[in-house]
C-alpha cells in the first residue's frame, strides 16, 4: 500500500492572513524556523503561501511593510489528504516547490508537507525494500528513490537525501 501525504503531514501549520506585513511574516518564520507560511482568509480557506523566496524578493525591493498578499503565491497547487507521497513529490519537483499544502475538499487546510518530509518517507520505503538504510548501502550500486541516482561511496546521491 502506498504512503499517503496525510500519513506524514505536519498538521500544526502556522498561518497568516493576507493583510499581515512581510516583516511580521518573516518574524513568525524565524521564530518557528519555518520555510513558509500558509495564507488563509477569514473563513480559514487557503488563499496563498508565502515562502522564504518571497520574503527575500520583498526585502530586496525594500518592501517589508507591504502585506504578504502582494508577494505570496496565489494559485496554490495543493494536494488532497489521499494523495500518494510519490505524486506529491512529482508535483513539487516539476514546479520547484519546497512546501505543499494539503487542502480538504472544503478548501480548508489539513496540513503541509515539505520536500524533506517526502524524502524521509521515501528513504523509509528504501529501508523497507532493501532492509538497510541508505548510509549502509553506499557505493553498492543502490539507487536513491528520490532522485534516481546511485548512492556514492560517501553515502550521498544527486539530491543529497541518500545519506539518510
From Swiss-Prot:
Any Pfam family matching the protein: CBS
Protein name stated in the entry: Uncharacterized 17.7 kDa protein in bps2 3'region
Keyword entries, A-Z: CBS domain, Repeat
CDD domains reported for this sequence: CBS_pair_arch
SMART domains assigned: CBS
Alphabetized Gene3D superfamilies for the sequence: CBS-domain
Domain CBS stretches: 9-66, 72-128
Paired cysteines (S-S): none
Listed PANTHER family: CBS DOMAIN-CONTAINING PROTEIN, CBS DOMAIN-CONTAINING PROTEIN CBSX3, MITOCHONDRIAL
Species whose genome carries this gene: Acidianus ambivalens (Desulfurolobus ambivalens)
InterPro entries associated with the record: CBS_dom, CBS_dom_sf, Diverse_CBS-Domain
Superkingdom of origin: Archaea
Amino acid at each position: 500500500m502506498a504512503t499517503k501525504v496525510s500519513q506524514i503531514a505536519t498538521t500544526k501549520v502556522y498561518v497568516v492572513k493576507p493583510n499581515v506585513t512581510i516583516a511580521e511574516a518573516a518574524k513568525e518564520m524565524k521564530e518557528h524556523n519555518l520555510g513558509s507560511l500558509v495564507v488563509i482568509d477569514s473563513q480559514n480557506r487557503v488563499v496563498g503561501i508565502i515562502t522564504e523566496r518571497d520574503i527575500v524578493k520583498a526585502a530586496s525591493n525594500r518592501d517589508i511593510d507591504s502585506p504578504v498578499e502582494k508577494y505570496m503565491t496565489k494559485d496554490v497547487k495543493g494536494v488532497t489528504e489521499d494523495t500518494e507521497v510519490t505524486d506529491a513529490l512529482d508535483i513539487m519537483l516539476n514546479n520547484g516547490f519546497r512546501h505543499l499544502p494539503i487542502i480538504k475538499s472544503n478548501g480548508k487546510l489539513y496540513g503541509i508537507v515539505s520536500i524533506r518530509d517526502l524524502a524521509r518517507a521515501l528513504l523509509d520505503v528504501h529501508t523497507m525494500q532493501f532492509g538497510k538504510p541508505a548510509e549502509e548501502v553506499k557505493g553498492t550500486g543502490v539507487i536513491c528513490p528520490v532522485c534516481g541516482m546511485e548512492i556514492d561511496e560517501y553515502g550521498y546521491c544527486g539530491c543529497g537525501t541518500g545519506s539518510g
